[in-house]
Design a protein with these regions (language model features):
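NAD(P)H cofactor-binding loop motif with strongest signal on the N-terminal glycine-rich segment
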Residues: 148, 217, 240
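Glycine-rich phosphate-binding loop and adjacent beta-alpha segment
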Residues: 176, 182, 220-292, 325-329
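Short glycine-centered segments of the SAM/dcSAM-binding site in methyltransferase folds
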Residues: 84, 142, 168, 234, ...
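Glycine-rich beta-strand-centered segment in the early N-terminal region that forms part
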Residues: 21-38, 50-92
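NAD(P)H dinucleotide-binding glycine-rich loop of Rossmann-like/cofactor-binding domains
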Residues: 78, 84-148
Length: 329
């Protein structure tokens, strides 16, 4: 089968369009003929040599796939050959065929295209898990979402509008993305390059602060994030693009009863991910099937041009997701 392999760690030029052996499903696994996968920030970090896959997972890049079941391993009961599915995988998505655990896979309605489906698992599950399950965001509260225009942020905005329609949504974004972020349903869009988002949050909320923050920047934003949190607010930390070390005023955090929760999806235990996916499928997949929530595809590339897709990701001008299309689909 065709797949993207790495000649070495480094830039996009290390990605090669190669022929490798098609995997065989083991117990509890399904083999998916992949129609589409998407590019995620962890793929870039793994390509650079800084984010190895969990033990036992494929070293091929790609954390989510959409396609059709080709075959099933022993013990699989839900899916059979020919079923449309979308799956969260620990690796192996940048290939014509990918293995997925059956309980990490979800049924894919005919109303959802494979290109859209390829955008679901990594970003929508991440947004839903951290905002609603861990962050405990409730209706009529306030939320600050960083990185407007990125896959997780656009997913988070849509989920807030669908699941907590009375929630006030604040989003940070670059100048060129402000109008498009607003069109997704954000009530307030803050130009982080021109404004202090902490000052803007205090102004917008009349100095109260927000109840939940979804942040992938980390150290660079920590002080401003804590200043932006309301009493008993929660900072959901899902990335460290802006650094891993920062000072924290613990006294203020204690007095204001604030929480910081660090969270990643990929390294969670298999059974825990299966539970999260089952809850997500019940809560969110019907909304996507109905068109209430719509994955945003900014650009598509043939699998052979994965290096160009990574270059686009690293330049940061995309809005929504970048999708790779498999050959002969």
């Amino acid at each position: 089968m065709k797949a993207i392999t790495l000649s070495d760690f480094g830039g996009p030029e290390m990605m090669q369009y190669s022929d490798i052996e098609t995997p065989t499903p083991g117990a509890g696994q399904i083999l998916i003929r992949v129609h589409a996968t998407s590019v995620n920030r962890p793929d870039v970090i793994q390509r650079q040599g800084n984010y190895p896959p969990p033990p036992g997972d494929s070293e091929v890049l790609g954390l989510e796939v959409a396609g059709v079941v080709e075959s099933t391993g022993a013990g699989c009961e839900r899916f059979r050959a020919g079923d449309r599915v979308v799956a969260l995988v620990g690796g192996g998505g940048y290939a014509e065929y990918a293995l997925a655990l059956e309980n990490h896979s979800m049924a894919l309605a005919e109303s959802i295209s494979f290109e859209q489906a390829a955008c679901i698992c990594e970003t929508y599950i991440t947004a839903w898990l951290n905002l609603f399950l861990l962050g405990e965001l409730q209706d009529k509260k306030t939320v600050l979402i960083h990185g407007g225009g990125g896959g997780v942020a656009t997913s988070a905005i849509q989920l807030c509008r669908a699941l907590t329609p009375a929630t006030e949504i604040l989003v940070t974004a670059s100048t060129g993305k402000l109008e498009r972020v607003s069109a997704q349903g954000a009530h307030h869009v803050i130009d982080y390059r021109e404004q202090s988002f902490a000052d803007e949050v205090r102004r917008i909320t009349d100095k109260r602060g927000v109840d939940v923050i979804l942040d992938h920047i980390g150290a660079k934003y920590l002080d401003s994030n804590m200043k932006s949190l309301a009493l008993a607010g929660t900072l959901m930390l899902i990335g460290v693009m802006g650094g891993i070390k920062a000072e924290l005023n613990l006294a203020t955090m204690m007095v204001k009863r604030q929480r910081i929760i660090g969270s990643v999806l990929r390294s969670r235990p298999v059974a825990e991910k299966a539970s999260i996916i089952a809850k997500f499928e019940a809560a969110v997949m019907p909304l996507i099937a109905a068109g209430t929530v719509t994955p945003l595809v900014d650009a598509t590339f043939p699998l052979a041009e994965a290096a160009a897709a990574h270059t686009m990701m690293e330049r940061g001008g995309h809005f929504g997701k970048i999708v790779l299309i498999m050959p002969n689909t």
